[in-house]
C-alpha cells in the first residue's frame, strides 16, 4: 500500500526512539512551563499537552481550549522544544496553527469516525504540518489506514501513526489492550510510515510505562509519546499514568535499542529452519482439510449438521492441554484451532450446498 510520504525529521539525540513528552492536559501556565522546563533540561525536544480533552463522560476536565495555546507558544519560545497537541475539529486545527503548534495529532475517538476525519482532512488542505494519527478505539486496521489515507490525500506528507492500544470491556492488566499484531501489520503494509507507541494510554499505570517502552523498542517502533507531569499525583486528568520528567529520563536511560536490520549467517540458517517448518505446517493443514472435506461428504450423505459442538469443544480442550505441555499458551492454541475450524466449516458447507 502506497502513501505519498516525506520523513518527519523529528529532532532527537539518537536515531531511535524520538520522544514526545508532556502532561496529559495543559492545566495552568505554571504547570505547563514547569513541566516543559524540566523536560527540556533532560534533553527532550518535543513537548505535548492536551488543550482540548475528549473525555469518556461529561463533568471531567475537558481542557482549557484556546486559553492554553499561548502557554504552548511560550514553551517553544523559552525552551526551543517543538510543541504538539490533539485536534478533533477544523476549529481546533485553525487555532493550533494560529498559535504556531508544530505537530498535530488525531485522537482515537476521532480516527474512528470517517466523517470527523474527512472534516479534519479538508481543514488541512494546503497546510504543511506533521500529523500523527492515533489508532481507532476499536481494533480495526482498515479504519486506521483509512484515517491515514484521508489525511494524506489532503496533501499532508509528513505523516505518522500513534499506537495507544484498543478499548476492551474486560480490563485486566492494561487500560487499553496492546494487540501488537495490529501495528505490526500496519508496518508490514506501509513500511515507510513511522509508528510511535503511547505506553501511557496502553498501560494506564506508571509501573507499566517502562516495560511497554522497552517492548515497543523490541518491536521496532520509531518513537514514544509519553505523558509526563511536574506533579503527577495532582494532575487534573489521567494522574495514574503520568510520570515526572525525572522518572521519564530514568526510564529512557534504561532502554535497550536493538538493531533493526543486522543479520548474521547463524540467523539466516535459523530463519531457513522456520521456513521449512512453515512449509510443513501448510502441508499438514492441506492434509487436514482434505480429511475435513471427506467428513463433509459423509455428513451430507447421512443428513448430519456441519457443526458438532461436542466434538469441537473436545478438540479445543485437548489441544489447549497439549499446548501447555509444549510451552505454549492454551489461548494461543484456541485461536489457531478456531481459525482452522472456521475454514473447515466453510469447506464442508460448500460440499453440503453442492447440487
Predicted regions mapped to residue ranges:
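Domain-level signature for soluble enzymes in the chorismate/prephenate branch of the shikimate pathway
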Residues: 260-355
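A structural motif
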Residues: 41-44, 101, 156, 221
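Catalytic beta/alpha-barrel core
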Residues: 64, 80-89, 93, 102-116, ...
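N-terminal amphipathic alpha-helix/helix-capping segment at the start of soluble metabolic enzymes
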Residues: 1-20, 74
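Catalytic alpha/beta core domains of metabolic enzymes, predominantly
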Residues: 12, 116-250, 254, 259-265
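Glycine-rich, proline-tolerant flexible connector loops at the mouths of alpha/beta enzymes
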Residues: 48-66, 230-239, 295-306
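Hydrophobic faces of well-ordered beta-strands that scaffold small-molecule active sites
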Residues: 17-23, 45-49, 83-85, 104-106, ...
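Active-site mouth loops of central-metabolism enzymes
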Residues: 17-34, 58-60, 82-87, 107-108, ...
Amino acid at each position: 500500500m502506497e502513501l505519498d510520504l516525506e520523513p518527519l525529521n523529528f529532532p532527537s539525540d539518537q536515531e531511535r526512539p524520538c520522544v514526545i513528552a508532556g502532561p496529559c492536559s495543559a492545566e495552568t501556565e505554571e504547570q505547563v512551563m514547569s513541566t516543559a522546563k524540566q523536560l527540556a533540561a533532560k534533553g527532550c525536544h518535543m513537548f505535548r499537552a492536551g488543550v482540548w480533552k475528549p473525555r469518556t463522560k461529561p463533568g471531567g476536565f475537558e481542557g482549557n481550549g484556546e486559553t492554553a495555546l499561548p502557554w504552548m507558544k511560550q514553551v517553544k519560545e523559552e525552551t526551543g522544544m517543538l510543541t504538539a497537541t490533539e485536534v478533533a475539529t477544523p476549529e481546533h486545527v485553525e487555532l493550533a496553527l494560529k498559535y504556531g503548534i508544530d505537530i498535530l495529532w488525531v485522537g482515537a475517538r476521532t480516527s474512528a469516525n470517517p466523517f470527523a476525519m474527512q472534516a479534519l482532512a479538508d481543514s488541512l488542505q494546503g497546510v504543511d504540518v506533521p500529523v500523527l494519527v492515533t489508532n481507532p478505539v476499536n481494533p480495526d486496521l482498515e479504519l486506521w489506514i483509512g484515517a491515514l489515507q484521508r489525511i494524506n490525500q489532503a496533501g499532508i506528507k509528513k505523516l505518522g501513526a500513534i499506537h495507544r492500544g484498543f478499548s476492551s470491556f474486560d480490563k485486566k492488566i492494561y487500560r487499553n489492550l496492546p494487540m501488537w499484531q495490529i501495528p505490526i501489520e500496519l508496518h508490514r503494509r506501509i513500511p515507510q510510515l513511522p509508528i510511535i507507541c503511547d505506553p501511557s494510554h496502553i498501560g494506564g499505570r506508571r509501573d507499566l510505562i517502562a516495560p511497554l517502552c522497552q517492548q515497543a523498542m523490541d518491536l521496532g517502533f520509531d518513537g514514544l509519546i509519553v505523558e509526563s507531569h511536574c506533579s503527577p499525583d495532582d494532575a487534573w486528568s489521567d494522574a495514574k499514568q503520568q510520570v515526572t520528567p525525572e522518572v521519564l529520563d530514568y526510564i529512557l536511560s534504561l532502554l535497550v535499542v536493538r538493531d533493526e536490520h543486522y543479520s548474521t549467517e547463524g540467523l539466516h540458517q535459523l530463519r531457513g529452519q522456520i521456513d521449512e517448518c512453515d512449509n510443513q505446517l501448510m502441508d499438514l493443514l492441506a492434509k487436514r482439510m482434505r480429511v475435513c472435506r471427506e467428513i463433509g461428504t459423509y455428513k451430507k450423505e447421512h443428513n448430519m449438521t456441519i457443526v458438532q459442538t461436542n466434538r469441537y469443544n473436545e478438540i479445543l480442550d485437548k489441544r489447549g492441554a497439549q499446548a501447555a505441555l509444549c510451552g505454549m499458551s492454551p489461548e494461543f492454541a484456541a485461536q489457531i484451532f478456531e481459525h482452522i475450524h472456521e475454514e473447515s466449516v466453510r469447506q464442508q458447507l460448500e460440499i453440503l450446498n453442492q447440487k
